[in-house]
């Protein structure tokens, strides 16, 4: 039959997928490309059976009723979109028919499972998985292949994987069903169904990550969501704004995720992985955040929209270090932003005026001080670790400013640096003068032998009172020896002049004693 051909054709593919590196970026694309090559999209069928694909269509559903009702396929039921959470399992689970021979030899093979009667329940329908806690995309990505294989073995015969549309056919064309589900998810976005895309990633929350009872409770009540899955799973408006070109379709898909809680996990309907989803928040702006939240969430008729906003903090609290802590600083709400803009416009008006009434610790000419005064008030609700370093540095620089100075912290910084440089140069000058002080000290000692009147004269000012200094003194230029020689020559000249004057007086018949008494 077809099941045995399927076993031979998918052994290598399953082994390659399971042994693949879980953190590889191309792991999902390679598996998807191989499935696309094997299954043509033109041959379509809605048959579902033991080997049903792991990605559920909106038309294929299993109601959480007794096992006689579970084996009948429900079309367009009221809970058709709520139990699809079972099917977010890796495509490697579809080839677990091979593994079932090793786990339970007495279990019927895939050939007999195709023609099993509708009244027979599966072997282990209510077995709880070992991991029942909610696993974030980071922890899912780092699971070893052995753990995944063990989980898939346990869940291989779950009712979600063994549902069938018409078991009376006693046959299931697996490629046609897979191609049908691929096309339903990729092309039927116009329907009011869950547009879950076929490429599975490591970030998909699998069926073994939550207990079966919780899934049953989710499918019974479509309006209520369990407290650990409602807001933390689906309300991602502050962190995942839709920046892609198909923003309208992505927003509508997000609405389908919120309207049908149990049919999705932490992943969006786009084929991107969790890394791409969570990295969008860093490149997003506040306007796109507010617009996306108001358009996609509030526009949709959701009875639990206030609960989504109320439990937003619970979604971020158990997250590991995958999402950076600086992300919350980027996600300031639009209200503080408007407050900052209004204050900035007021400050611009105040800068244009006289700037008389100002806080002494608030410097408006410095742009950094404005950000230091405003950023802590806007980021108190989110995360101040991103702005703490900047605020400390800025407040340190702004506190060093005096209230009356209008200079920026950079100018004061340079001014404080320039003061020690002036002190250094002044001290150097003093040291050079102290080294050169013995040389000027010799001049008074050498000139003390002379007239010692013109020693302190450093310049010549030609006035009426300077006649005696010019005649009797010596020019201050030259060394001490030159000064001494010139002083000696001046004394000799004065002596000669005095002697010539005395001779002239004697020759004229004057009184020489009376003249000497007047001159001396």
UniProtKB/Swiss-Prot annotation:
InterPro entries: WetA (IPR040112). The keyword Cell inner membrane does not apply. Keywords: Activator, Conidiation, Sporulation, Transcription, Transcription regulation. Induction: Expression is positively regulated by pcz1. Residues 109-118, 155-165, 378-392 have a biased composition (Polar residues). The keyword Transcription regulation applies. It comes from the Eukaryota. Residues 109-165, 378-454, 468-496 are annotated as: Disordered. Signal peptide: none annotated. Residues 445-454 have a biased composition (Low complexity). Residues 420-429 have a biased composition (Basic residues). GO terms for biological process: conidium formation; sporulation resulting in formation of a cellular spore. PANTHER family: DEVELOPMENTAL REGULATORY PROTEIN WETA (PTHR22934:SF25), PROTEIN ESC1/WETA-RELATED (PTHR22934). BrlA, abaA and wetA are pivotal regulators of conidiophore development and conidium maturation. They act individually and together to regulate their own expression and that of numerous other sporulation-specific genes. Belongs to the wetA family. This is Developmental regulatory protein wetA. It comes from Penicillium roqueforti (strain FM164).
